[in-house]
Amino acid sequence: MAMNIMIQGTMSNAGKSLLAAGLCRVLKQDGYRVAPFKSQNMALNSFITKDGGEMGRAQVVQAEAAGIEPDTRMNPILLKPTTDVGSQVIVNGQVRGNMQAMEYFRRKRGYIPAVLEAYNSLASEYDVIVIEGAGSPAEINLKQDDIVNMGLAKLVDAPVLLVGDIDRGGVFAQLYGTVALLEEDERRRIKGVVVNKFRGDRAILEPGLKTLEQLCGIPVAGVIPYAHVDIDDEDSLTERFDRSKDRKLLDIAVIRVPRISNFTDFSPFEHYGNVSLRYVDQVSDLHQPDMILLPGTKSTIADLRWLRQSGLEAAILKAADAGTLVFGICGGYQMLGRTVSDPEQVEAAGVTEINGLGLLEMDTEFRGEKVQTQTRGVFCGVEGMLSGLNGLAYEGYEIHMGRSQQQMPALTGSRNVYGSYVHGIFDAPGITDTILKALCARKGVSFDALATFDAYGYKERQYDLLADVVRGGLDMSFVYRVLRREV
């Protein structure tokens, strides 16, 4: 069986996901076959594996860092929020239905066999399993029947590194308070604490670290500096929204619908030096972008109503009429059609049909069975502004409940309005270049002013940079002793 180590945090956004990804990369560089694991993940950003299973993107990032194919065994339970108190429950990559929070809380212990089967299967194939917890292990109201933090650590006998975020302040209270709220057997599982996102001179931190070690009786395993590493992170949505809204040579506006999902679809546009990618949720911020992107959503009908009530629908229609490129992905694509119907009440009770924006000649109907598949092909028959895509290869994945009358498998539309069910459609080489060239031609500017972008090479360099940061801040000799059970 594989060696294992678990990354737990003092809170959400402490940096567990990226630290786990960085550790996966370091171990890969050191010659180990390593796989990530998170028993239960809650996220709207998901991914479809080659065999058609759905999993959280955090473990996809970690798998990529480890140099292996994403596998639903790495995330056997995925919860996709549908309301403030309910989620779609996905087990081993397949939808089990929608549940209210209390119902899931009562039933989650029944998923332990699925969690252990997935974990043991991975552990039989790899040298090391890097496990990520969720939130904090000290959420005393959630400790009963826990299957994602200390409960999981006990099930798979995993040693733990506890991570605290110093960037938001109070890291010593975070770490000490978390340890203090744990049971004695749980405290013994914590082999080291890690201070994450540190800015400044570590020497200033040393007195506090020594006191923390004395108070907790646990060594400090590392201080990870705050690093500007460009890697998709499921907790990074707020940061993306808060980025500078300065407009550059080309201006792309993403409509920030309330239930946005798979926002990482648009990451390729962020890497061009003279392209701004802005998230917009009110008409006054839309201005006159060169391209409008309608993202995926967990609730197409609810977000379509919001789009209408906010005035953004009228603004998008006006922009499209003026020739602005409009592109919808998944739920955003559905919104661009004539109607969206839900006769089986798949999304929510009370609405059976709603008018779309009417920019694409198609209708969408929701059905109970979910489409989840990887897809690839070559663009053909594309007309209008994006005709330059013809002949280019694409690949990605589909996750949707709706069925639409599509003109082509990957892309529907003509003139200046297009839509697709394919998440990741902008990732393949040449696709973003072609779209940006079309925008430049319409605007009368030179594409040479935009730096071309190699998505795969860039991502690999970022994983290596993350590994450098983790290797430099974490005591890896200590980590290896933890893995070998010498601590």
Predicted segments, located by residue:
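Flexible phosphate-sensing "switch/lid" loops adjacent to ATP/NTP-binding sites
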Residues: 2-320, 325, 342, 368-369, ...
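Catalytic nucleophile serine of serine hydrolases
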Residues: 330
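A conserved active-site-flanking secondary-structure segment within enzyme catalytic domains
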Residues: 337-392, 396
